[in-house]
């Protein structure tokens, strides 16, 4: 399996394509709150993915150097989700809460789909 450092550019581009679609949906449909929520959640999801890749790199580097590895950033991912919820609750007419949560889960779904597609290509 490829490491996250090599897969990250591909995953980032998929998420940026999704963000572009969400921006088009926000601009051309009447579902502004839903697409704004997807944009907020997916943008924070992209940050979480970048942070996860960075933490895994630091984790592996610490193991290689024989040091005690630090956490892989779970608290930061929870804090990002909490930030998204606080923003959504503060502006309920602007952001749809369920679409924010779906957006936050985007990078998990993109990773799974990418893994399945890459495994099918190798066969």
From Swiss-Prot:
Subcellular location: Cell membrane
GO biological process: proton transmembrane transport
Gene Ontology, cellular component aspect: plasma membrane; proton-transporting ATP synthase complex
Membrane topology of the entry: Multi-pass membrane protein
Residues spanning the membrane: 15-35, 36-53, 72-92, 97-117
Keyword list, A-Z: Cell membrane, CF(0), Hydrogen ion transport, Ion transport, Membrane, Transmembrane, Transmembrane helix, Transport
Function: A possible function for this protein is to guide the assembly of the membrane sector of the ATPase enzyme complex.
Family: Belongs to the bacterial AtpI family.
UniProt-recorded name of the protein: ATP synthase protein I
Biological classification of the source: Bacteria, Bacillati, Bacillota, Bacilli, Bacillales
């Amino acid at each position: 399996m490829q490491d996250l450092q090599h897969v990250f550019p591909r995953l980032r581009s998929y998420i940026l394509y999704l963000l572009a679609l969400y921006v088009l949906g926000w601009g051309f449909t009447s579902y502004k709150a839903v697409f704004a929520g997807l944009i907020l959640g997916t943008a924070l999801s992209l940050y979480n993915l970048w942070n996860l890749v960075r933490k895994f790199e630091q984790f592996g580097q610490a193991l290689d150097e024989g040091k005690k590895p630090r956490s892989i950033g779970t608290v930061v991912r929870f804090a990002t989700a909490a930030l998204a919820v606080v923003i959504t609750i503060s502006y309920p007419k602007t952001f749809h809460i369920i679409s924010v949560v779906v957006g936050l889960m985007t990078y998990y779904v993109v990773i799974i789909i990418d893994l399945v597609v890459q495994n099918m290509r190798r066969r």
